[in-house]
């Protein structure tokens, strides 16, 4: 009888300990789960080591299109932070009461570029140049759920070239995939985030698109309700908007309070 009772107590202790450790990394430190727009991949990964040391925690990123991530969060995906490439998807989650009050914040304004492979012989300097027949495939992120794809579509429409190129578009599931299409030569050109073009500058040539041709890419973030580590999640956003500003700027983002004219 005592042996059975002892085994039950041991099993119960393992269950309790396992539940407590599920929100921690293998080193026992808490893990902050961050769902982030794909244009943030390289800059967030640059921030990761210093912030982890500072907060004595681990960061775990899930990158994708903002719309897809927002849908997953609405459907129950458990994360601590949502960093979107626009403000609309954060607002949607706020209206659904899925973010912690007072944590929603602007952290950057994004820019888009026309990009071609570095070794390409194409002379593409303006959106109008994309009309040329020898530009056979043009990559953008899917505008239905990717803010950078929506901005690319708006820019093409504003420049009066959308109808001429729509049948040549190659849609990436997110901005990172659209950038890869250009880098690997699976597209002759693309309209992609400046941040990703900078991170791949050895492989891409890029020209800034006039920001007046599309709605501003006001990138917002928030801490999610139900976060197990809301204090550390908020600390990460404070880091992005504080010490991380220099890295954001180096990666092509316009920061809150700064002018778009650059």
Residue ranges and their predicted role:
Residues 24-56, 60-62, 67, 71-77, ...:
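Exported/periplasmic ABC-transporter solute-binding proteins
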């Amino acid at each position: 009888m005592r042996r059975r009772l002892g085994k039950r107590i041991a099993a119960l202790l393992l269950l309790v300990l396992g539940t407590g450790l599920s929100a921690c990394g293998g080193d026992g430190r808490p893990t902050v789960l961050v769902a982030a727009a794909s244009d943030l991949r390289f800059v967030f990964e640059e921030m990761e080591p210093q912030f982890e040391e500072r907060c004595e925690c681990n960061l775990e990123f899930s990158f994708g299109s903002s719309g897809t991530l927002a849908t997953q969060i609405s459907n129950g995906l458990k994360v601590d932070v949502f960093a979107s490439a626009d403000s609309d998807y954060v607002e949607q989650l706020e209206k659904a009461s899925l973010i912690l009050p007072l944590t929603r914040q602007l952290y950057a304004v994004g820019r888009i570029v026309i990009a071609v492979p570095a070794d390409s012989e194409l002379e593409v300097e303006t959106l109008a140049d994309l009309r040329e027949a020898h530009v056979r495939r043009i990559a953008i992120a899917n505008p239905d759920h990717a803010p950078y794809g929506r901005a690319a579509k708006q820019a093409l429409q504003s420049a009066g070239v959308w109808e001429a190129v729509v049948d040549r578009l190659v849609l990436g599931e997110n901005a990172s995939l659209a950038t890869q299409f250009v880098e690997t030569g699976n597209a002759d050109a693309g309209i992609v985030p400046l941040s990703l073009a900078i991170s791949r500058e050895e492989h891409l040539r890029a020209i800034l698109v006039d920001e007046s041709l599309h709605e501003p890419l006001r990138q917002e973030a928030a801490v999610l309700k139900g976060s197990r580590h809301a204090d550390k999640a908020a600390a990460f956003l404070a880091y992005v908007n504080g010490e991380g500003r220099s890295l954001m700027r180096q990666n092509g983002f316009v920061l809150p309070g700064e002018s778009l004219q650059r």
